[in-house]
Each structure stands twice: as structure tokens, then as C-alpha cells.
């Protein structure tokens, strides 16, 4: 390829999946320099195939998984835990309490209440400063503002606060990577809904979405990082008695599982467009049945799930069962349980749909050399 014009080489490499291109990074100086070129990484993000990988959070760690889906016998291979070491603390292991994925970046809340952004593919990290203002039970999400030339990443942080002794409200902050600082977005907003997911929500096309509940109905709550405002959207079902969980498919589709307490069926709904607050098109992609379970077993309600579109299979972690992954197929009432190594933490493990990317973590100029060492 050394005889090809540089523009053509760049165009070819921009179509190579991130994990494959990473192996070619040090083939020559020209290719290595592309990894530091933001224009190229933006081009690669738009053109390269999205290869979805499965990560499992459990016991304060993130573990890659390989899932073999076969109706004659499915299996799961758990690979080595991704090692994240902190050079600020004698290269000690970083224990991750929560993880949120956006564009190949992992926003991690640590066990000792710190916050960092991590690109496992590139081995880059950036610690986020709280300025001694950490709030217990804060929720965090990562998204971006859509610019013409590139994406500008931000972090949303919100937590509950008492407006009066008997009245609870919410407070919202936005973190800007360029200034390494937080600013107040909304202060002391009256709380008239509740988030009904135990997870942190999901990222879809740069925005974050959660399942929420008010006095009358379930709905989808979205945060637009470009406009910096919340929006309320419809769900396939809005009954308060139903159980729903959000997921994403290769960062291209938003998916929701729907279970009714009175039914043995789980419906999988999907959409690839969210145009406005009033119009949103959900399509029921397939359904799975739990008829194979005996009457003495309660239905397994999932707290996270992934789907295989081609085989129409749901892979889920189960509420209240820290040591099991369920695999349910739409055909022939297929059902299997795959054990997970025992956990020492009383929270159910959950899946993270991870798509490796070359997205660079924007470093504040004053802290460009203050990076955490990473081992994978």
C-alpha cells in the first residue's frame, strides 16, 4: 500500500474495524499518526463496520464474553477481566461500581466514588474532577453535542435533593471536557417522575435514554446533549404493572423488552428512529415464551439483555439471581441457563453492549500528560 496515494490509504483504513486496525497501528509511522488525527477518527467512526462485543459487569470488574448460540447447546466463554490500573495509587487495580457505554467509551464510577472515561481499544483514560463535590447516589451518562465537523462529548450528572423537608427535587450538572469543569444545568427541579431502571440508562445516537414512571404511565425519558434538555417519548406499552428494560443493538437500534406479570411471554420491540417527542415508531421484532418453565418456578424478569437479530434469541441477566445468564429463543420455546462464576457482590451482573472505536478522549491542555496507565 506504500505506492497508493495517502488519501486512498486513509479511505481504505477508515473502513477497517477498530479492533483489526488497532493491530496495524504500528506498521508504519503514517498509519500510527492517523490514530492521533481527529479528522480521521471521525471518518473511521462513520464508515467502519460496527462490531458489537459483550461485556459483563460483576464484582466491580468488566469481563469480555464470547457467546456461542446454538439450539443444540449454547455456551458462554468468559475471558480475562479487563485490567484497569491507576498510576496515581501505586498502580492499584481500579474497581468499577457502574459502567456506561457510548461510542466505544466507557464512563466508569469507581468503588471509591471517583469518575473516569476509558477507551479500552486505545488504552486511553481520563479522570474526571469532582472538586470535592461528590453526591451519593448520583447518576452519570455520557453523550455528545452534534457539530458539523466532530462530536463534542459531555457528561450529565444528576441526583435527588430535598427542596423542602417534605419535597424531593432533582439537580443537574454538565461536565465539559474542554474546560475540565462542571456547570449547573438545572437546579432544584421538582421531581414528578421516577426512573424505574436499576441501570444507568443507555446511549443511542449521542443521547441518553431511561425508562421512567409517573403517577399515570410508563414513558421513555431522553436527554438531548445538543440542546441540553430532557424530552418525554412514548413506549410500546405504558402500563405501570409491566416490566421493561432498555438495550441497544450495535449502536444502531434502540430496543426494549416488555414483560407482563400475568403472562409467560416477553416481547422485544425495536426502533431506529427517534424524531420528535410526539412521533416514535416502535416495531415488535419477536416474542419469546417461558412455557418450558414448570409452574413452581417464578418467571425470570431480566435486568439487562442483548439480542441476536438473526436467530431471534434473547440473552439476559436475571433479577435476584447473581449467578445465572438466561438464553431464550423465539423458535421451539428454546430456553437455557448458563452459570456465571459466583459473585461476592449482592447486585445482579449486567451486560454492556460495547462497540470498539478509535474515538479519542479529549484531554484538558493543562492535564495532557496526567494519564492513567492501562493494562488489557
Curated annotation (Swiss-Prot):
Enumerate the PROSITE patterns for this protein.
FBOX
Pfam families linked to this entry = F-box, FBA_1
Query: Cross-referenced InterPro entries, in alphabetical order?
Result: F-box-assoc_dom_typ1, F-box-assoc_interact_dom, F-box-like_dom_sf, F-box_dom, SCF_F-box_component
Highest taxon of the lineage: Eukaryota
Which SMART domains does this UniProt record tie to the protein? Answer: FBOX
Q: Where is the F-box domain?
A: 1-44
Quote the PANTHER family the UniProt record gives.
Answer: BNACNNG10540D PROTEIN, F-BOX PROTEIN CPR30-LIKE
Looking up NCBIfam families in the UniProt record yields: F_box_assoc_1 (TIGR01640)
Write down what this protein is called: Putative F-box only protein 9
List the source organism.
Arabidopsis thaliana
Amino acid at each position: 500500500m506504500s505506492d497508493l496515494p495517502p488519501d486512498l490509504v486513509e479511505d481504505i483504513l477508515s473502513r477497517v474495524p477498530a479492533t483489526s486496525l488497532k493491530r496495524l497501528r504500528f506498521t508504519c509511522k503514517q498509519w500510527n499518526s492517523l490514530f492521533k488525527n481527529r479528522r480521521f477518527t471521525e471518518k473511521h467512526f462513520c464508515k467502519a463496520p460496527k462490531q458489537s462485543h459483550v461485556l459483563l459487569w460483576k464484582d466491580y470488574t468488566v469481563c469480555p464474553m464470547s457467546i456461542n448460540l446454538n439450539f443444540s447447546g449454547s455456551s458462554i466463554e468468559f475471558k480475562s477481566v479487563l485490567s484497569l490500573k491507576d498510576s496515581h495509587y501505586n498502580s492499584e487495580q481500579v474497581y468499577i461500581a457502574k459502567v456506561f457505554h457510548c461510542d466505544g467509551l466507557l464512563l466508569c464510577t469507581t468503588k471509591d466514588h471517583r469518575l473516569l472515561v476509558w477507551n479500552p481499544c486505545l488504552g486511553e483514560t481520563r479522570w474526571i474532577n469532582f472538586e470535592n463535590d461528590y453526591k451519593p447516589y448520583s447518576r452519570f451518562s455520557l453523550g455528545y453535542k452534534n457539530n458539523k465537523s466532530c462530536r463534542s462529548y459531555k457528561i450529565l450528572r444528576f441526583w435527588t435533593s430535598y427542596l423542602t423537608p417534605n419535597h424531593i427535587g432533582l439537580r443537574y450538572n454538565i461536565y465539559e471536557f474542554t474546560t475540565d469543569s462542571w456547570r449547573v444545568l438545572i437546579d432544584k427541579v421538582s421531581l414528578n417522575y421516577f426512573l424505574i431502571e436499576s441501570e444507568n440508562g443507555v446511549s443511542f445516537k449521542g443521547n441518553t435514554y431511561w425508562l421512567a414512571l409517573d403517577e399515570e404511565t410508563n414513558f421513555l425519558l431522553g436527554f438531548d446533549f445538543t440542546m441540553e434538555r430532557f424530552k418525554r417519548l412514548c413506549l410500546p406499552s405504558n402500563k405501570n404493572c409491566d416490566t421493561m428494560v432498555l438495550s441497544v443493538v450495535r449502536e444502531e437500534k434502540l430496543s426494549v423488552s416488555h414483560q407482563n406479570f400475568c403472562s409467560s411471554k416477553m416481547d422485544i420491540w425495536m426502533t431506529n428512529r427517534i424524531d420528535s417527542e410526539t412521533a416514535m415508531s416502535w416495531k415488535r421484532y419477536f416474542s419469546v415464551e417461558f412455557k418450558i418453565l414448570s409452574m413452581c418456578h417464578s418467571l425470570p424478569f431480566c435486568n439487562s439483555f442483548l439480542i441476536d437479530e438473526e436467530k431471534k434469541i434473547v440473552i439476559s441477566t436475571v433479577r435476584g439471581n447473581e449467578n445465572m445468564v438466561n438464553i431464550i429463543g423465539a423458535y421451539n420455546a428454546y430456553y437455557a441457563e448458563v452459570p456465571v462464576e459466583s459473585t461476592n457482590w449482592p447486585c445482579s451482573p449486567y451486560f454492556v453492549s460495547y462497540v470498539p472505536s478509535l474515538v479519542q478522549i479529549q484531554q484538558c491542555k493543562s492535564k495532557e500528560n496526567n494519564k492513567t496507565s492501562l493494562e488489557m
